[in-house]
Amino acid sequence: MADSTSGVAEAKADTLREQHLQLLLEIEPAKRCSCPLAGPDSAVEDVHTQLDGDVCHAEVTVGDGDASKVVHATTSVGDDCLCRAFAEFECVPRIRRADGECIVVETYLSDRAVITDLVERLDELTERVCLRRLTSDGRGDSTESKTATIDLSSLTAKQREAALIAVHHGYYETPRRTELATLAEALGISKSALSQRLNAVEAKLATAVFDSE
């Protein structure tokens, strides 16, 4: 699927910034979400969107049997607009899949600290947000998280922050690329406090895995 979706409230052509963090998010839209991707009639293959004030113009390519068709949708942009939420943090959402149940979005950020704020904002607008992949590239040590899907909506803000920094710095890789003390120093907390947060995260994720089986 081509990189296609763009939604930026205000153009800032004079601002250039390397976006070296790649996120892949799985989002379950709110029940009354106005986005045309929240309830497509068929599987979405490609999306192009353009925000014009409070109006969203979308051209959605959907599967239609053995063929495909392009559907144009014009909707009023509400407070639940996902494109606007991404634009608040100066990143562009790229729709990778939408099937009526969830929307898979890829985006890039320049600062790890923004991840938590972005996820918290999306969590306010949606039923559920899951981080499927966190990748760091463009810095000479490209590494991709090998962990399973993390349901971020089940974690507290502090647990979410601890989980994200642990994944990003390779704490759960084998062998580990960082130590607990280094992560605790980066967060400005004690090793014991970080250990408690990560233990709580791991317990919640383990419970979620068994509950889904």
From Swiss-Prot:
Q: Which GO terms describe its biological process?
A: cellular response to dimethyl sulfoxide; positive regulation of DNA-templated transcription; positive regulation of transcription by RNA polymerase II; response to decreased oxygen levels
User: What is the deletion mutant like?
Assistant: Cells lacking this gene have no dimethyl sulfoxide (DMSO) reductase activity under aerobic, anaerobic without substrate, anaerobic with DMSO as substrate nor under anaerobic with nitrate as substrate conditions. Cells are not able to grow anaerobically by dimethyl sulfoxide (DMSO) respiration. DMSO does not activate transcription of the dmsEABCD genes induced by the anaerobic conditions. No effect on aerobical growth or growth under denitrifying conditions.
Gene induction:
By anaerobical conditions and dimethyl sulfoxide (DMSO).
Q: Which domain of life is it from?
A: Archaea
Molecular function in Gene Ontology: DNA-binding transcription factor activity
Keywords, A to Z, come to: Activator, Plasmid, Transcription, Transcription regulation
Q: Which InterPro entries match?
A: DmsR-like_N, HTH_bacterioopsin
Q: Name one Pfam family in it.
A: HTH_10
Where are the membrane-spanning stretches?
A: none
This molecule's function is given as:
Involved in activating dmsEABCD gene expression related to dimethyl sulfoxide (DMSO) reductase. Required for anaerobic respiration on dimethyl sulfoxide (DMSO).
Q: What is this protein called?
A: Dimethyl sulfoxide reductase transcriptional activator
Q: Which source organism?
A: Haloferax volcanii (strain ATCC 29605 / DSM 3757 / JCM 8879 / NBRC 14742 / NCIMB 2012 / VKM B-1768 / DS2) (Halobacterium volcanii)
